[in-house]
Design a protein with these regions (language model features):
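A long, amphipathic alpha-helix that forms part
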Residues: 40-54, 118-161, 222
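C-terminal, low-complexity/hydrophilic appendages and adjacent surface loops
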Residues: 186-187, 251-294, 329-344
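Long, internal low-complexity/basic segments
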Residues: 111-129, 137, 292-344
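Formylglycine-dependent
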Residues: 1-78, 115-124
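A short beta-strand-to-alpha-helix junction
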Residues: 100-101, 128-139, 183-191, 200-217, ...
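Short catalytic/ligand-binding loop motif for oxyanion handling, primarily in non-cytosolic enzymes
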Residues: 60-61, 69-76, 172-175, 179-182, ...
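Histidine-centered active-site microenvironments of extracellular/periplasmic hydrolases
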Residues: 73-76, 150-204, 211
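Polar, surface-exposed loop/tail segments
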Residues: 31-34, 38-50, 61, 73, ...
């Protein structure tokens, strides 16, 4: 489909004034707004997609539909908030001294001064309201994803169309004392990845560590197109077809200069630019509350995961976004000869 329209620009609509959180470096805010679904960007994207699926297409097509929610700000009409009364919510897991066993560079790197902290949310009583706003946003977008899928299922393309649902990043909703995406921990890098395809196994759930880099090779493979040797990812078609469990796969996340996390089926290993480390066992510690990096019993695990680290990290350049998230990033830019842009 050689036209653009499946992603409306911006993160709005926005009220005239923020409801709770006021910062010029983040969209973070929450509350009931606007009054109607029709005023939401995602509603317009969904309607565009439905229109495209109702058209006749005489050749294969690719249709991308970009939904904003549950990206901040967590605004949605009242009916979506009503589905999640604050007094009935279960709060995300939070440990007050969670970061006591991580290296100093981890605390410096992960500091996000423009975002709310969980301590602040607890003290002000806003945490249930934040979670309500987040869940309202999820319910809203879930409904309109469903509207697009219903349009597909009612179209002539229902039986020969591959559907992939994914998110570009995760989010901390109070875990690790933050409401942010900026981290090398699980909540930031774990994203939805759902594939519905002809020949796939219905209802199958895989615990394999996969990456968004795998999406393009997967779609090439499923569409019967030639593989591209330049792609770093690997096709997930064997996993979707139930032919492979995906054992031995790894996914990497990077944040800042030369800081990387490796996620396998069981462990997450983080190594920072100064050599400091974190290691978490997701079988026994899904909340990543116990850093095992200094435990000699896990030396072999660290060594195995470290083999997945890149041989080198790309240098920062003047075209790098210079907005400093925190003091650590500002210093990192200066060491690279780049004057950081710092917003107040």
């Amino acid at each position: 489909i050689e036209e653009y329209g499946g992603r409306i620009r911006g993160f709005g609509p926005h009220p005239e004034n923020e409801f709770v959180w006021d910062s010029d470096r983040t969209n973070t805010d929450w509350g009931v707004f606007p009054e109607r679904d029709e005023d939401m960007i995602d509603y317009k994207s969904a309607m565009w997609a439905k229109d495209k699926l109702n058209e006749e297409h005489d050749r294969p097509f690719f249709l991308a539909v970009g939904f904003i929610r549950p990206h901040a700000p967590w605004y949605a009409p009242q009916k979506w908030f009503d589905m999640h009364p604050p007094e009935q919510l279960t709060m995300p897991p939070y440990l007050e001294d969670d970061l006591d066993d991580v290296p100093q560079i981890s605390r410096d790197l992960h500091e996000v001064p423009m975002m709310p902290t969980t301590e602040w949310a607890i003290e002000t009583g806003e945490w249930p309201n934040i979670v309500q706003g987040y869940l309202a946003s999820v319910s809203f977008v879930d409904h309109y994803i469903g509207e697009v899928l219903k349009a597909l299922d009612n179209s002539p393309y229902a039986d020969n169309t591959i559907v992939v649902l994914w998110g570009d990043h995760g989010y901390h909703i109070g875990e690790k004392n933050r409401f942010a995406k900026h981290s090398l921990w699980e909540e930031t890098s774990r994203v939805p990845m759902m594939i519905r395809a002809p020949g796939g196994v219905e209802g199958q759930v895989s615990e394999a560590a996969v990456s968004l880099l795998d999406l393009y090779p997967t779609l090439l493979d499923m569409a019967g197109l030639p593989a591209c040797a330049a792609n770093e990812g690997a096709s997930l078609k064997p996993i979707v077809a139930g032919e492979d469990k995906g054992a031995g796969r790894y996914a990497m996340t990077s944040y800042g200069y030369a800081n990387h996390a490796i996620r396998g089926e069981r462990y997450r290993y983080i190594r920072f630019v100064d050599g400091s480390e974190e290691l978490y066992d997701h079988r026994d510690d899904p909340n990543e509350w116990t850093n095992l990096a200094d435990d000699p019993a896990y030396a072999e695990v660290k060594q195995r995961l470290a083999q997945q680290l890149p041989d080198h990290s790309a240098a920062l350049t003047p075209v790098t976004s210079r907005t400093a998230v925190n003091d650590h990033f500002a210093e990192m830019y200066r060491k690279a000869g780049i004057e950081p842009r710092i917003k107040n």
